[in-house]
Every structure is written in structure tokens, then in C-alpha cells.
């Protein structure tokens, strides 16, 4: 269990230490590894939770009965400076200290960048020589640079079994690129409340409600990277979210503006799974299985403002959402 923190840093660093011998890095254990991994990864998973919930609607008015809508949604989530770093206090860790003996430092999350590099000293128990230390450089962010935005895209379809009621589904196929697999799907229901009014045409705006569920799962298989001996070594992430939204829009034939007030609830689970064979190269060896599991829950309000232009069967919309992670969306739809 003493090598888990070093293993975690190796994986998070995307191969920075691939030329080093993991067996020389006897690290600080599961507790410290999970603590650091949680602070390091949480802003990234939260940004995804907010990002994959955009683009569910482009108007407040429901479709005609038996109407279809097929569209492509592109979204960009913006990253605030406060999400790019966190304060790492050595008092929160059992076997870690900074190389210069600082009590705390501001270090990068997965969305940030350490410039210059920041190192920590990991204390471990050697079976012969007792307590020993090894120096490890903390991982920087994705791509070794600051991340200012995270893009997403998906196909979305809608069907109206009744006037004013629209069933929605969105999908992004699971694609494998360089041992990384990511896929997304979701379902939603949008109901126009003003469609129930006896004189709905006299009402100046359309008001509707939306409930939507989105699931994203991804995995990174690094067994063949040779970071440490073992089998079926992967990082797996599962994200599940629910969105409740109240929507209002104008009801003109070509150009309309719309807005929404929503409540978002999401949960992410990130696991380091597989077997990891670690040793000191001489006497000590140990196999660690599924060492780390990180869970994060998110709730928050959001406000969306946008516009929609309809030209025959086709329409295009753009909107901006203000939330813990702001975002902008662009959609292209065909309705019939």
C-alpha cells in the first residue's frame, strides 16, 4: 500500500515518469493518494458535469404532434482561474512534505499548470533501512498547460407524441483513441405548459419545463504503458446527472429569444482499477488491487439566455449559460 501515491502521480502525469523505475518510488499510501487525486481531479470532472448538460433546449414552444427534430449540438465550457489550482497543505497528508519544507503551496489541478515544477518528498518504510524518502514532481494539468475551455458535441433527436410534449435523446458513440474510450447518452422530456391553455395563441410567450438525464463514461487502459507491472490497469470514470429547467421563449415564426432557469445535480465516480505489482527491487513485494476510488457530488443553479433563427425546416440557435462553469452552445436542427 505504500506505493500507491507514487503510482497515482505517474498515471496523472501522463507518462512524465515513464523513464523512471516505479519500484524506486515507495510512496505514501492510499489515504494520501486519494486525498491528492480528489483535489487534483475534481475541478475537471465538475466541468464535465456542467458541460454535458448544455444544449437540451433551443426554444420554449413545443412541437406539433408527431413532429421530429434532429440536431447537432456543440458546446464549450469555460474554465475559471480558481479551478486551475488548489492549496495543498502538508498537514493534510501523513507521509508527504514539500522539498523546501513549505507548509503549503498552490499547486495545479488537472486544468492548471505548475510553472515551475513543484516537487514533494514521499516517506516510505524500507524493510532493511527503515524510513526513506524519494522526491517526486507533482503532475501538471492536461497537456502540460493551462486549460481554458473544454469542448463537447453530440447528436440529439426529439419526437412529439402529443402537441407540446417532446421526448428527447442525445448520443455520442463510444470511441477509442490511444487507449482512451469515451461515450455519452441521455434522455429528456420537455413539456410546454402554455399548450394546455384554452387560448394559447393569445399568450405572448411559451413556457415549458424540462427534465433530463445524462450519462458519460470513459476509461483509459494503460496496462501496456509499462508504468508498473500488473494486469487490466485502467482509470474508469462514470458521470450521471439530472437537470430540471424552467424555460420561456417568444413565439414568432422566424426569430425567437429564449431563457431558462435550471437546477443541476450530478455525481462522478473515478476508479483506479487493476492489479499493481510493486516491490523495492530486493526483498519486499506486494500486489495491490483496485487501490483508489474517488466520488464527487455536484449541485447548482444555472441561467441560460439564447436566440433561435428558423428558416423553413432548418433552424440554428446559440446560447450562453451562467453557472459554476460558464458555457456557450451552438445548435443546428432540422424539424419536420
Residue map of PLM features:
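Short loop/turn motifs that connect adjacent beta-strands in outer-membrane beta-barrel proteins
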Residues: 58-66, 79-81, 194-207, 253-254
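Transmembrane beta-strands of outer-membrane beta-barrel pores
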Residues: 74-78, 171-175, 193, 211-217, ...
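Extracellular/periplasm-exposed beta-strand and loop segments of Gram-negative cell-envelope proteins
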Residues: 83-85, 131-147, 176-182, 214-241, ...
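N-terminal, post-signal peptide beta-strand-biased segments of exported outer-membrane/organellar beta-barrel
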Residues: 18-104
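Repeated loop/turn-to-beta-strand initiation elements of outer-membrane beta-barrel proteins
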Residues: 79, 164-167, 196-199, 254-257, ...
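Residues on the lipid-exposed face of transmembrane beta-strands in outer-membrane beta-barrel proteins
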Residues: 59, 70-72, 155-161, 187-193, ...
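Residues that define the transmembrane beta-barrel architecture of outer-membrane proteins
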Residues: 64-66, 148-153, 181-187, 203, ...
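Outer membrane beta-barrel transmembrane domains
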Residues: 258-336
Amino acid at each position: 500500500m505504500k506505493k500507491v501515491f507514487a503510482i497515482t502521480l505517474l498515471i496523472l502525469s501522463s507518462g512524465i515518469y515513464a523513464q523512471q523505475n516505479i519500484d524506486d518510488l515507495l510512496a505514501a499510501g492510499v489515504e494520501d493518494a486519494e486525498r491528492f487525486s480528489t483535489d487534483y481531479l475534481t475541478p475537471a470532472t465538475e466541468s464535465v458535469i456542467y458541460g454535458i448538460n448544455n444544449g437540451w433546449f433551443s426554444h420554449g414552444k413545443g412541437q406539433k404532434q408527431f413532429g421530429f427534430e434532429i440536431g447537432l449540438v456543440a458546446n464549450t465550457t469555460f474554465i475559471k482561474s480558481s479551478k486551475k489550482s488548489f492549496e495543498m497543505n502538508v498537514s493534510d497528508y501523513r507521509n508527504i512534505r514539500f522539498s523546501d519544507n513549505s507548509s503549503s503551496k498552490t499547486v495545479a489541478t488537472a486544468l492548471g499548470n505548475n510553472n515551475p515544477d513543484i516537487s514533494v518528498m514521499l516517506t516510505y518504510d524500507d524493510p532493511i533501512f527503515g524510513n526513506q524518502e524519494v522526491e517526486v514532481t507533482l503532475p501538471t494539468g492536461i497537456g502540460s498547460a493551462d486549460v481554458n475551455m473544454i469542448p463537447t458535441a453530440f447528436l440529439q433527436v426529439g419526437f412529439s407524441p402529443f402537441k407540446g410534449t417532446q421526448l428527447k435523446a442525445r448520443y455520442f458513440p463510444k470511441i477509442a483513441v490511444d487507449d482512451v474510450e469515451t461515450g455519452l447518452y441521455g434522455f429528456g422530456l420537455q413539456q410546454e405548459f402554455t399548450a394546455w391553455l384554452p387560448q394559447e395563441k393569445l399568450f405572448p410567450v411559451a413556457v415549458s419545463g424540462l427534465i433530463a438525464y445524462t450519462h458519460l463514461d470513459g476509461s483509459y487502459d494503460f496496462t501496456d504503458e509499462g508504468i508498473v507491472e500488473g494486469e487490466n490497469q485502467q482509470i474508469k470514470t462514470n458521470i450521471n446527472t439530472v437537470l430540471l429547467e424552467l424555460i420561456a421563449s417568444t413565439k414568432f415564426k422566424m426569430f425567437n429569444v429564449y431563457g431558462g432557469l435550471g437546477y443541476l445535480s450530478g455525481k462522478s465516480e473515478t476508479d483506479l482499477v487493476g492489479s499493481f505489482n510493486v516491490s523495492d527491487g530486493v526483498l519486499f513485494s506486494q500486489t495491490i488491487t483496485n487501490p483508489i476510488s474517488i466520488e464527487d457530488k455536484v449541485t447548482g443553479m444555472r441561467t441560460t439566455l439564447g436566440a433561435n433563427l428558423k428558416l423553413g425546416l432548418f433552424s440554428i440557435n446559440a446560447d450562453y449559460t451562467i453557472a459554476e462553469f460558464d458555457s456557450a452552445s451552438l445548435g443546428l436542427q432540422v424539424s419536420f
